[in-house]
Amino acid sequence: VRKMMRQNGLIVDPGCSWVEVKGTVHAFLRGDNFHPQIKEINALLERFYKKMKEAGVEGPESSHMDIMEASKADIFCGHSERLAIVFGLINSGPGMPIWVIKNLYMCQSCHNIVKFISREVRREISVRDAEQFHHFKGGICSCMDEGYRS
């Protein structure tokens, strides 16, 4: 739908996510490559992606919706909630929960990777998207994957 809107010249809101770390709110746009820590963020995302593949977990390229809307590079590291979550992990203390607010719906690919990250780092990650509240803990989401099953 968003692709068709762009093709028809309609304005499409960019995906944006916000995370608070140490009292400061940080904003990330989809495909944000201008953040001062973007190399560190992308490096950690790449490590998570490799661990997912090794563990046989459904990775970012598996989501049909994402394949239609973005290149593999965008799918892998361009979604704003992934950037915000990893920024939060890098810049907060061990065991601290991560809270992210996103202006759009969280895609299946992001949902899968955040479940994996929450289990891998043993941290609670909460994401409020345009549709619902997701609380990830130990690789399980409070939404019980409703709407994300294949």
Protein language model regions, located:
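Terminal (and in a subset, N-terminal) low-complexity or junction segments at the ends
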Residues: 1-150
